[in-house]
Curated annotation (Swiss-Prot):
Induction section of the entry: By galactitol.
Record GO biological process: D-tagatose 6-phosphate catabolic process; galactitol metabolic process; phosphoenolpyruvate-dependent sugar phosphotransferase system
Protein name (record): D-tagatose-1,6-bisphosphate aldolase subunit GatZ
Family (UniProt): Belongs to the GatZ/KbaZ family. GatZ subfamily.
Species assigned in the record: Klebsiella oxytoca
Length: 419
C-alpha cells in the first residue's frame, strides 16, 4: 500500500481497487484477474462480515487462511495480497453501551492485526447506546486513537513495516443505504481538514506519533453513492475544493460505495486523489447476474427433475429468512421481489453462504459443466462473454463464465488506473 500511495503522491496516475467481498468466487475472480501481472490485490473484510464472533460469514480472522487457500488454488503469490479491515470499530455493537462496545472493538482490532491484516480502517464514527447522536468529532478521534493504540501494541516490528491506517468519519452506511437517495453531500475541504486535525491531536495525546506516519488515507464523500434503484455519479466540479486540499498532505482519499460508476468516473476519481476505491455489491451483483443467466440456460438444457432450482431456492430462503433485506426493500410484494432479485444494493449477497443456496449453486454449475453450452444461449444471456469466447479468450464452462462476468467490474476500475 505504501508504495502505491508514494507513487500517487509523486504524480503518477495510480490508485487501487479495494475488493470488499468474502465470496470465494469474487475473491478467485480478483486474484485470477491479476494472476499474470505484478500488481498487488487488495481484499478487505468488513467488521460485520468477519469478527471475533464470526460475523455473517461465520468467519473470524481466519478469513486470511480462507483467502490464502483460494490463492494457492489459483496459483497467486500470497505476498502480492494485501488484506484490509473495513469499518473496524463499534459498528457491530452500536446497541451496547460505549464502554462495552469499545472493549469489543479493541479485541477486534487486535485480532485483525495479529492475523496479518495490514490496512486498517479505524472507524469509531458511530454512536453507541449511551452516546449522543451525532457523536462529537473529538470523541470519534479519541476512540480511533484508542483502536490505533491496540493495533500498535499488537503488531510485530515486521508487521509495522507494512501496517497502514485509514481514518475518517464520513462513511456510507455499512451494508448499504436503507432508503432511497436523492442527492449526496460532498465532504467540505474544511471538514476533511478538521478530521485530520482532531485525529492527529488524539493520536499524539496517546504517544502515537509513529503511528501517524502510517496513516495513508482519509475517508471522504466525493459525491458518489447508490441505493436500490439509482446511482449518484461522480461530478468532479462539485468535489474540486476537496480534491485540491489533499494535495497539501502526504495522504490520499479513500472513497466508499464507488460501485456502478462509469469507467471514465474511475479515471477522474483517481486523478482527483481518491486513490483507494472500494467496491463490493457491484461484484456480487455481477455474480448474481451470471448465476441467474446460467439458471436460464439450465432451464433450456436440463430436464426439470434434474435442475438446481437455484432461483426458486433463493426466493424460498430469502422470504423465509428476511432479516438481511426486510428493512431495506420496498413493502409492496411485487416491488420487494424485484428488489430481492435485481436491487443494486444486492442484498442477496448475504445469503450465498446459506447451505441450501450454496448447494443449489453447486448443482447448477455441475449440471451445466456436464452439458455443452450452445453458443447461441451464451450470446442470449451473457453476450459480453460470448464476444470473448469468439476471440478464444474464454472457455464455455460455467465457472469461467462466472469469473469473467465478475471481472467485467474490475476491468472498469483498471481503466481508471485503479490497479
Amino acid at each position: 500500500m505504501k508504495d502505491i500511495i508514494s507513487r500517487h503522491k509523486a504524480g503518477e496516475h495510480i490508485g487501487i481497487c479495494s475488493v470488499c467481498s468474502a465470496h470465494p468466487l469474487v475473491i478467485e475472480a480478483a486474484l485470477s484477474f491479476d494472476l499474470h501481472t505484478n500488481n498487488k490485490v487488495l481484499i478487505e473484510a468488513t467488521s460485520n462480515q468477519v469478527n471475533q464472533f464470526g460475523g455473517y460469514t461465520g468467519m473470524s480472522c481466519d478469513f486470511r487462511d480462507f483467502v490464502n487457500k483460494i490463492a494457492r488454488e489459483v496459483g497467486f503469490p500470497s505476498e502480492r495480497i494485501i488484506l484490509g479491515g473495513d469499518h473496524l470499530g463499534p459498528n457491530c455493537w452500536q446497541g451496547e453501551p460505549a464502554a462495552e462496545a469499545m472493549e469489543k472493538s479493541v479485541d477486534l482490532i487486535k485480532a485483525y492485526v495479529a492475523a496479518g491484516f495490514s490496512k486498517i480502517h479505524l472507524d469509531a464514527s458511530m454512536s453507541c447506546a449511551d452516546d449522543p447522536v451525532p457523536l462529537d468529532p473529538a470523541i470519534v478521534a479519541e476512540r480511533a486513537a484508542r483502536l490505533c493504540q491496540a493495533a500498535e501494541e499488537t503488531a510485530t516490528d515486521e508487521q509495522k513495516r507494512h501496517l497502514t491506517y485509514v481514518i475518517g468519519t464520513e462513511v456510507p452506511v455499512p451494508g448499504g443505504e436503507a432508503s432511497t437517495i436523492g442527492s449526496v453531500h460532498v465532504t467540505r475541504a474544511q471538514d476533511a481538514a478538521a478530521t485530520l486535525e482532531t485525529h492527529e491531536a488524539a493520536f499524539r495525546k496517546l504517544g502515537l506519533n509513529a503511528a501517524l506516519e502510517r496513516v495513508i488515507a482519509i475517508v471522504v464523500q466525493p459525491g458518489v453513492e447508490f441505493d436500490h434503484t439509482q446511482i449518484i455519479h461522480y461530478q468532479p466540479e462539485a468535489a474540486k475544493a476537496l480534491s485540491a486540499w489533499i494535495e497539501g498532505t502526504p495522504m490520499v482519499y479513500e472513497a466508499h460505495s464507488t460501485d456502478y460508476q462509469s469507467r471514465q468516473a474511475y479515471w477522474a476519481l483517481v486523478r482527483d486523489h481518491y486513490a483507494i476505491l472500494k467496491v463490493g455489491p457491484a461484484l456480487t451483483f455481477a455474480l448474481r447476474e451470471a448465476i441467474f443467466s446460467l439458471a436460464q440456460m439450465e432451464n433450456e438444457l436440463v430436464a426439470p427433475e434434474s435442475r438446481s432450482r437455484v432461483m426458486e431456492v433463493i426466493d424460498e430462503v430469502m422470504l423465509n429468512e428476511p432479516g438481511y433485506w426486510k428493512k431495506y426493500y420496498r413493502p409492496t410484494w411485487s416491488q420487494a421481489m424485484a428488489d430481492i432479485h435485481f436491487s443494486l444494493s444486492d442484498r442477496i449477497r448475504y445469503y450465498w453462504p446459506h447451505p441450501r443456496i450454496r448447494q443449489s449453486v453447486e448443482k447448477l454449475i455441475a449440471n451445466l459443466t456436464e452439458t455443452k453450452l450452445p453458443l447461441g444461449l451464451i450470446s442470449q444471456y451473457i453476450p459480453v462473454q460470448f464476444e470473448r469466447l469468439s476471440l478464444n479468450e474464454l472457455a464455455a464452462v460455467p465457472h469461467d463464465l462466472i469469473l469473467d462476468k465478475i471481472q467485467d467490474v474490475l476491468r472498469a476500475y483498471r481503466y481508471g488506473r485503479a490497479i
